[in-house]
Regions:
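Small/polar-rich, solvent-exposed N-terminal microdomains that initiate assembly or binding
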Residues: 1-69, 134-139, 143-156
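Intrinsic-disorder/low-complexity loop/linker signature
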Residues: 9, 24, 88, 97-101, ...
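Amphipathic alpha-helical interaction segments
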Residues: 12, 19, 115, 185-186
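Secondary-structure boundary elements
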Residues: 17, 124, 189-191
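Oligomerization/assembly interface segments of phage tail-like spikes and tubes
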Residues: 70-86, 172-190
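Acidic-leaning, charged glycine-interspersed low-complexity segments
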Residues: 105-185
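Protruding loop/beta-arch "assembly-hinge" segments enriched in small, turn-prone residues
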Residues: 187-200
Length: 200
């Protein structure tokens, strides 16, 4: 089973702006949620949450790919959340609220593009691993992530349709938090045979 959430959490750990602590003892910046609008862990703790942070929707959104009946198309929903800086008003400096709001939106956009660049490299490295072209000891963070993945997960990465990724910001939510939603399609092979081991 392809667990994209685990790959995204690994990225959140090595990506400096997030610096997620996977053990939950320090800075938590990665969340597994149903939807951004539901009462989830981030929403319950937004006043204490570290900024920036990200969330992955664990809801399954899939369909049979029309162009290829042997494939399934999955749609992955990822959210980047950035808290808008509080405006500062004093005799020397007046920070326009619209400026801090724009900064938050563009910061989320920058993180989306950083993730897509990372996933592009991850796809290339997993393709090398699948083809047996990664014979050296893993050196980079990307090589270490790919080498730790089972073959099925490496194949799942190759199905990510990054060129068709779509993203955009939502109106402000949760007391000065801005959300940028990212949608990525993944094409996976469909089971064509009944697995007899799953039946009596």
């Amino acid at each position: 089973m392809f667990r994209f959430d685990n790959i995204l959490e690994a990225w959140a750990c090595i990506y400096k702006p997030l610096s997620h602590d996977i053990n939950g003892h320090g800075r938590k910046t990665f969340y597994r949620i149903d939807t951004i609008n539901n009462n989830n862990e981030f929403v319950q703790n937004y006043n204490l949450a570290a900024t920036p942070c990200m969330a992955y929707s664990t809801l399954v959104d899939a369909s049979r790919a029309r162009a290829n009946a042997k494939s399934i198309s999955y749609r992955h929903s990822i959210y980047f959340m950035v808290k808008q800086a509080a405006p500062q008003h004093n005799a020397k400096t007046v920070v326009n609220d619209a400026d801090t709001e724009t900064d938050a939106k563009y910061y989320a956009d920058e993180m989306v593009q950083d993730l897509l660049a990372f996933l592009d490299e991850l796809k290339k490295e997993s393709q090398r691993a699948i083809n047996g072209n990664s014979t050296h000891q893993p050196q980079t963070a990307i090589e270490r992530i790919v080498s730790a993945l089972p073959k099925e997960e490496q194949m799942g990465i190759n199905g990510l349709q990054l060129d068709g990724a779509e993203w955009g910001t939502f109106p402000m939510k949760y007391n000065r938090w801005w959300v940028c939603g990212l949608e990525i399609e993944q094409i996976s092979p469909r089971l064509l045979c009944v697995n007899g081991e799953k039946y009596y």
